[in-house]
Amino acid sequence: ADFDVFIVGCGPAGISAGLSSIQHKLRYKIVEQEDSLGGAVYHYPRQKIAMTAPVELALIGKVRFAEVQKEKLLEFWQDVVEKTGLKVAFRERMESIVKEGDKFVVTTSRGSYSATTVLLSMGRRGTPRKLEVPGEELPKVMYRLSDPAQFEGQAVLVVGGGDSAL
């Protein structure tokens, strides 16, 4: 196999898995369809408070954030990536996974790779599920909200849910 572990997504879980891979001297590949790390947190509105629990990160140690603004959390993760040399293939989208014997063949937008293990750490926001209704591609239809202030005083319709919907 090309890799011991193939990691899809570079949010908190993907970063943690990559760090553990380095610590255990595993051959790994992380692919992220977006152009930056952070997963769903990257798409939170500006200054949104992210609630986190203390965690132990491989190579880093104990991390304690109770409430932290999105930007500070992303900055922390970027520092972790730089300090540890974590390698991430940005703008590479996973397209399929096929089991072949004792390994998996993962096809992405850039090629095919074989791996002993595949970890799907893409969270819930990777690619929005569209409703397949007329008008969903119109200019005023949005799938991500980065600055709620631009809609202040306006009527909006939110379709979907989750703790980051509003």
Model-derived features: positions:
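FAD-binding core/adjacent interface of flavoenzyme oxidoreductases
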Residues: 1-3, 23, 36, 43, ...
